[in-house]
Amino acid sequence: MLGINYTATFGKSMMSDRRLMYVNPNHGDATDNGNTGENPEQPFLTVAAALARTRDNRGDVIFVGQNDAWTYGGGSTWQTAIAEEVTITTEGVSIIGTNPGGLGVYWNPVTAAGAGTCITVHAMDVLISGFAFEGGAEGGTGIYALWDGATMFGENMIVRDCYFDSDMDIGIQLNFSWNCEISGCNFQECDSVGIYCDTADSGADYNRIHHNIFHDCGAGGIGAISFQGCSENHIWANSIFNGSAQGGGAATDEGIDTAGGGDNQVFDNYFSCANAGVGAGDYDDLNSASGTDAWIANHVMTGLAITNPA
């Protein structure tokens, strides 16, 4: 009998009617009018059209075709990026960019003045993988998972192998989003913050954030990971470079900030700063902790930091 082990090993769905759908705005036969999206030679034009055909908890998957829309892309064809702002309300859906390498399938926000969000998640158990959020109407947010205030929760989300560049103000924002996992992502100079929970929102708890790169996110702004007021998160094995801290300049709370929360475990992260006791730009300046957190063996330029940042 093929059961759970087969499903976990080979990624096969136990739901016989799982829909596999394809989106590719660069394909000559792509259209949202008449195609079902289930034939890769007759894909949808937009992600929104594919989402409209998804069903709760059936394991539906949307594959988004690669494009050559990067600034230095060498081709003259297939250069149309995904340029949409979509809201996911289907539980258990996966959206996967199919770039075989590089930064991911390029996805641009479209709302001007930094007000757009590429993907809003109002559903549980969503997987997002393989996208590069950049370009388009600069600013805005790459992914925002949140409770809708009623019955739809952006919980249990997985984001992996995505890229967020300096065109984005916020990489990923969580609001009352628990049990999410963010891994293998690259946050390159996001203007305001890499991963964020606004103190005016409900806390983001029980999340797992690991093996990500943050390079000068929120320089002079919020920072790499701002989880003020959030609790019981595990944050480990992240690489955080801050140019001001590296040079001995002030970088207050621009690393990891869990102040006001509690019971977070933060360990084995790498910071471009000196250990505590130096002053501007040191471990205590770059980071903030709750008194009930456990910060364990984090790496700084002068060795190991073995206490909670003050």
Regions found by a protein language model. Name each.
Residues 3-4, 44, 53, 97, ...:
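Beta-strand-rich, repetitive solenoid scaffolds
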Residues 77, 84-88, 103-105, 117-122, ...:
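Glycine-rich beta-solenoid repeat tracts in large extracellular/virion proteins
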Residues 29, 71-79, 89-142, 161:
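Right-handed parallel beta-helix/beta-spiral solenoid domain characteristic of secreted/periplasmic
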